[in-house]
Amino acid sequence: RGSXLTTLPLRNIMDMLHMGXITIGTP
């Protein structure tokens, strides 16, 4: 469970950053 808790946030942050980059890149 510890590894899952550590992996989920990282993936979530990466996804959020990716989505943010797409939102900023798309006017």
Swiss-Prot record:
Highest rank taxon of the organism: Eukaryota
GO terms for MF: aspartic-type endopeptidase activity
Post-translation changes: Glycosylated.
Keywords tagged on the record: Aspartyl protease, Glycoprotein, Hydrolase, Protease
EC number(s) recorded for this UniProt protein: 3.4.23.-
Tissue: Placenta.
Residue stretches spanning the membrane: none
Gene Ontology terms describing biological process: proteolysis
Family statement: Belongs to the peptidase A1 family.
The protein, known as: Pregnancy-associated glycoprotein 59
Organism this protein belongs to: Capra hircus (Goat)
Classification lineage: Eukaryota, Metazoa, Chordata, Craniata, Vertebrata
Gene coding for it: PAG59
